[in-house]
């Protein structure tokens, strides 16, 4: 099967064509801060896992929960200790955690783990029958006197942060030594396809979302995707204790049901937990802002299981490859990098005008004027978003914000083909969609000012941060 691996803007092509590669480990970076000394104690891993399902009546992205969930939403992760200050990775089955809520999540988990927020990565998987946390939006709404907002339920969101923090504190004394780690990839069959259909003139022609019944739109090629699922597996002796996977696609088969659910990635993750019950299975959504299952999904309930089975098969294959490739781990094998990036609000996002829209228009779900206002407010304050990188031997796991286009993930892989590079996106959800510079001139839903709160200028700082973390020579 042929896949278009990269369809990027001019600046992305320049980055890929001129970067020269060096082979050295990713150090601990945050601006000009010195590297954290590597400890001599053994590396340990503590998993945590809590319920993140909203109760009936609680706010979700597209209306309140009207029925109890059949399969819970989870907030789970790991704490790696023994290589400098602890490192925390967390994935939550919510549509997004943005702005001040993302800060609060990182701060809460950092305090529990005895580390700094700069060494904590929190990502949503982006399922749509799920909550949306944004404490900046919540504060702005309160200041404007807007009550009973249908989307933001900060009390519940803070409760989940507290649950996760308590789970970390409970897990740390039970941490297991990490003796080995391995990385593997497996191609995912018939899930991902590019949402943006581009014509011969380079302009947007049609949109192919998460579920499509139009045979003409279904018939277009998959387009630019990353067909591979990546897996990083940690072992304690012969026992797998954590499996971290990532795949770039919107994670929905169907939604707006009023029933909280983790959709097909959550089902796949559950299936894998039955295969390997000794490990915490931690799945992330990669740079899937312009990727969905539309070519292979018609929104029929039965197809959710089909997609889950395909994803679980790739998880199984990548796990097997990682097991085959496992290598001994020492504290020197583990590293963490953090580069703060300031993303400007796109031209035309005026705070006063957005505030008027918030007061005058009902909220119709993600995205809405309040989301643009929240990000633009933070951008005016030059708030930095941390782009981070976990090093485990020859593997690099990058952590990026927003609904990032897949071209960034492909570019990162091409920057360091000598390393095993993979990515989690949907970190700080504040920016909304983050397209390539070229995409903003093509048109389409993802780059509208109501969907993407940054402009084409975002590409440069993000690629620079990725290059810095991967230590690509300029």
Task: Indicate residue ranges for each PLM-predicted region.
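Conserved beta-alpha junction segments in alpha/beta enzyme cores
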Residues: 33-279, 284-288, 296-306, 319, ...
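Glycan-recognition surfaces in beta-rich domains, encompassing non-catalytic CBMs
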Residues: 315
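N-terminal secretory signal peptides that target proteins for export/translocation
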Residues: 1-9
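Bacterial N-terminal signal peptides
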Residues: 11-24
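Signal peptide processing junction and immediate N-terminal pro/mature segment
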Residues: 23-34
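Anionic-ligand-binding alpha/beta catalytic cores of soluble enzymes and soluble regulatory domains
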Residues: 311
